[in-house]
Amino acid sequence: MAKELFLEIGTEEIPAGFLPKAMADMEGLIRKELESARIGFGEVKTMATPRRLALVVKNVSAQQTDAEITTMGPAKKVAFNDDGTTTKAGEGFARGQGVDASALSIIATEKGEYVAVTKKEIGVATAGLLAEILPRLINNIPFKKSMRWGDQEVRFARPMHWIVALFDGTVIPFAFGNVQSGSMSRGHRFMANTSFPVRDFGHYLEECERHFVIPDPAKRKEIISREIERVAKAAGGNVLPDEGLLEQVTYLVEYPSAVHGTFSAEFLAVPKEVLITSMREHQRYFSLVDDKGKLLPGFITINNTLTEDPSVVVKGNEMVLRARLSDARFFFEEDKKVPLEKRVEALKSVLYQAKLGTSYEKMERFRTLAEGLAEQLQPPLKAKVFQAATLCKADLVTGMVGEFPEVQGIMGREYALLQGVDAEVARAIAEHYLPNQAGGELPASDTGAFVSIADKVDTICGCFSVGLIPSGSADPYALRRAALGIINIILAKGYNLPLIPLVTKAIGQLEGRLTRKKEEVLADVLDFFKGRFINLLTDRFPADVVEAVVAVSFDNLVEATAKIEALAQFKKRDDFEPLAVAFKRVCNIVKEQVTVPVDDKLFQDAAEGTLFQSFKSASSMVEEKVVQREYLAALTQIASLKGAVDDFFDKVMVMAEDEGVRNNRLALLQEIKSLFRDIADFGKLTA
């Protein structure tokens, strides 16, 4: 009979950022544990608030399923004599398994025949297994940081106060540290700080709401969304959409309520990004805008309690925000007194990275790269690119960015505009940080794009040059994001920009700082880009198609992407599979480079001449289509060789006894192979 499993872990306040991952980890762990224990189960749901993590599993089997367990023993020749009697080794294995030697069976493996014992294991009651599974699950939930409390040896994100563990309404007894499992949960810390009994999951939800706790984050998020829209409308404005803040606030409260506050309109003279950042990052406030998107002097904050007099809460929030915005206004007014170009020199005293020099030195390096990109792709922009690259890090030494690091680049743009800098240059100052998150906004201007690419390439090459290479989940310099940003900019803009010369130039500028060989750095950086490119493209195209193209064509990302698109289309056609088979036949024979040219005077069979003429005809067409980036048309031309290739293999013995004839035939096949490889390595494609 199926039953319900319910677990709640009650704690001190866990950081909001820990909770979504903890929920996902709990679900994965319980699924793995139940499957490993041969316990059937149905739907799994996890929930979290700052003070509790919970999960419910529906339709859990009351008993573990039976299983046949096979234990391998020694080799047959070790366990049995030639006459079939059991050796001491065989008898010892049987005795160790608790069976008679007659129960030994023979199993054939890749390494030979071995003896084995197969025993039926009768499933036990699930409840007893859960007493071992649940404390192990709790212990295995991974957190960025965990702690001990009191004199306990166990660790968790925050000190634990209670555990509810029920199976079919009955307590699963176990202890985690000094906390014993039971059936008693607790209400809201300030509004209902009492214990209450739990019978099952449905009862738990009812009792939580009676005690001012909404355990389900999806429901809390819905309430918050509804509340902030209601309060914003009452205040005569609209909520500035901020999904990240909404997600964060959802995990900061157990029982949300929204209140509206205001700030002096005089603060609106400060750039809106600073005001929004201050409210969002430091206070977790939602900003308000009018119907045209203009920032209003108001905010909405989410409380974790219901209050009889919200004005008291509002006044406290307004007072804190006023101090923050006063600081911002002060920094803004002071910063405006010094032109950005005069701040550039100050970058000489700002350390970028101990092994890579100052921010000024970094700026000089990527400015040269950016100029080169402009020269190559948009020569008229060279002067603007030079100016944007020179100024784009200058706001790092302003008071505003020192206080609010999140507005770097944005403040550079604002100060540049106030000081009469060209609008496109000012825009590029902000854009060079883009994209600043996965899937984020890309630079709109070419000026911003060139500086962004150059800055990121210098960062990646610099770090790789001194051994600061990402490993596992560790990527302190956000190099993966930088590489993806470069790739996305190049693809979005359609830049005809080979990577190898750009990366080579960037590494060359690091002369004197390299702690590794240039050749090693170049190879590693290109592999790094290749990995990011493959990951990005396999989200859109079949993995084998991406691998096949990247194996032969990666330097120019726009070209490689176009080839991938064409090959993905071509693979759906009826003539794809026969063509792939033909290519593999060619590759199976031409495994080493042949250095002799094709000589048609050495042909001995008409099929050789036919294939050679077909190749020459197709080759010129393929070359033309490749230059025009019409890769689907190029593939169609390559496909026209299929008949001639098949006829060649049917009628011609490639490995002829005559060395000259043999090498000539191999050279012909090598030409065919190279034609295929203008697009992709067909050998990597699956049917």
Curated annotation (Swiss-Prot):
It is an enzyme of class 6 (ligase). One of its GO terms (cellular component) is cytosol. It catalyses: tRNA(Gly) + glycine + ATP = glycyl-tRNA(Gly) + AMP + diphosphate. One of its GO terms (molecular function) is glycine-tRNA ligase activity. Keywords: Aminoacyl-tRNA synthetase, ATP-binding, Cytoplasm, Ligase, Nucleotide-binding, Protein biosynthesis. It comes from the Bacteria. It is found in: Cytoplasm. The keyword Ligase applies. The keyword Aminoacyl-tRNA synthetase applies. One of its GO terms (biological process) is arginyl-tRNA aminoacylation. InterPro entries: DALR_anticod-bd, Gly-tRNA-synth_bsu, Gly-tRNA-synth_heterodimer. Its EC number is 6.1.1.14. Belongs to the class-II aminoacyl-tRNA synthetase family. Tetramer of two alpha and two beta subunits. This is Glycine--tRNA ligase beta subunit. It comes from Geotalea daltonii (strain DSM 22248 / JCM 15807 / FRC-32).
